[in-house]
Amino acid sequence: MAKPSKTTTKKKVKKTVVDGIAHIHASFNNTIVTITDRQGNTLSWATAGGSGFRGSRKSTPFAAQVAAERAGQAAQEYGLKNLDVEVKGPGPGRESAVRALNNVGYKITNITDVTPIPHNGCRPPKKRRV
């Protein structure tokens, strides 16, 4: 019986990125953390729902903290050191996600709020009666 030929594959070399942008989308129901390079190419991402939190626990500051830690640790493979943070949305996980990225070991250079503000656009949802 013939021996199977060994195929040599080149190991994919990860590019090194020093500066990046952390996009934190904090809605009322979930928090999405995406870390990109300066051009906007995604390096890593994590969500509160994908981090094991379901239902109402998904919309907690602790879930946002865990999601930010997971995204930050995954992006460290690229040699990332400095982050600009762009926060979007009114969710409860805004500050805790930024704090978690700082605790992972990134130097946060500036924090920007990029929440879209309508010039009297769509009608907002009605107020909750609890």
UniProtKB/Swiss-Prot annotation:
SUPFAM superfamilies the UniProt entry points to: Translational machinery components (SSF53137)
Keywords for this protein: Ribonucleoprotein, Ribosomal protein, RNA-binding, rRNA-binding
Segments traversing the membrane: none
Single biological process term from Gene Ontology: translation
Record-linked InterPro entries: Ribosomal_uS11, Ribosomal_uS11_bac-type, Ribosomal_uS11_CS, Ribosomal_uS11_sf
Pfam families the UniProt entry points to: Ribosomal_S11
Lipid metabolism in keyword set: no
Recorded GO MF terms: rRNA binding; structural constituent of ribosome
Quaternary structure and interacting proteins, as annotated: Part of the 30S ribosomal subunit. Interacts with proteins S7 and S18. Binds to IF-3.
Protein purpose: Located on the platform of the 30S subunit, it bridges several disparate RNA helices of the 16S rRNA. Forms part of the Shine-Dalgarno cleft in the 70S ribosome.
Name of the molecule in the record: Small ribosomal subunit protein uS11
Annotated source species: Teredinibacter turnerae (strain ATCC 39867 / T7901)
Gene of this entry: rpsK
